[in-house]
From Swiss-Prot:
Record-linked InterPro entries: bHLH_AtIBH1-like (IPR044549), bHLH_dom (IPR011598), HLH_DNA-bd_sf (IPR036638), IBH1-like (IPR044660)
GO biological process: one example: regulation of DNA-templated transcription
Tagged with keyword Nucleus: yes
KW Signal (keyword) present: no
Native organism: Arabidopsis thaliana (Mouse-ear cress)
Region (Disordered): 1-52, 210-230
Name recorded for this polypeptide: Transcription factor bHLH147
Compartments where located: Nucleus
């Protein structure tokens, strides 16, 4: 048998080392792939989060602070009181924004609520800057186009199967889920329902605390207890 020369031995060595390095890379990829998949929290974890007392306390603090700011802004002395919605609609908007902030923008519905709030604020500033008589014609035109769009969507929805129609309705109810797939819509709906349940519990607790507390003291009266939202 012929002996392998040192030169040929050197030529053979890199192939074995490269194959070993390829194997090690494949092993690393296999090990790293499960960790990359487990980034989004499971529905059970999100349900536990919204049902915890700690999360309810965080939301309660944010909501009370937001309601105080709303009360101050709606006073006649405030400059922005005319542009702010009043009554139940204003409270609803504030409660939803506080809920989205408590969610930290980790879900589609929370990001949609926060982006909507930013858009509304931008529109209000734009209306204050520009006062044009042509705005009335533009608004009527936009209302007509919205009505036409709604009728087209209804006709399209009638041709869809029953399951797809229900998914469409569900995706419209949950913010930020209009163009999402069924698994995403179901995941977002589960999280949104759990968050709304916590919102109801918190608002009920705040309402009972406000109704049971004595009225705020009159000016000049000392020693009275302060109102929760005062």
């Amino acid at each position: 048998m012929e002996s392998i020369s040192p030169v040929s031995n050197q030529l053979l060595q890199p192939t074995t080392t490269s194959s070993n390095s390829d194997r090690s890379r494949r092993k690393r990829k296999k090990k790293s792939s499960p960790s990359s998949v487990e980034k989004s929290p499971s529905p059970s974890i999100s349900l536990e989060k919204w049902r915890s007392e700690k999360q309810q306390q965080i939301y309660s603090t944010k909501l009370v602070h937001a309601l105080r700011e709303l009360r101050i802004s709606q006073q006649p002395s405030s400059s922005s009181s005319s542009s702010i919605p009043r009554g139940g609609r204003a409270v609803r908007e504030v409660a939803d924004r506080a809920l989205a902030v408590a969610a930290r923008g980790k879900t589609l519905w929370s990001r949609a609520i926060l982006s909507k709030a930013v858009k509304l604020k931008f529109r209000k500033h734009k209306r204050q800057r520009i006062s044009n008589p042509t705005t009335t014609t533009l608004t009527t035109g936009s209302i007509r186009s919205k009505k036409q769009r709604a009728t087209v969507l209804r006709l399209k929805a009638k041709g869809l199967p029953a399951v797809q129609r229900k998914v469409k309705v569900l995706s419209r109810l949950v913010p930020g889920c209009r163009k999402q797939s069924l698994p995403v819509v179901l995941e977002e709906t589960t999280d949104y329902i759990a968050a709304m349940e916590m919102q109801i519990r918190t608002m009920t607790a705040i309402l009972s605390a406000v109704s049971s507390s004595p009225p705020p003291p009159t000016p000049g009266h000392e020693g009275g207890q302060t109102h929760m939202l005062g």
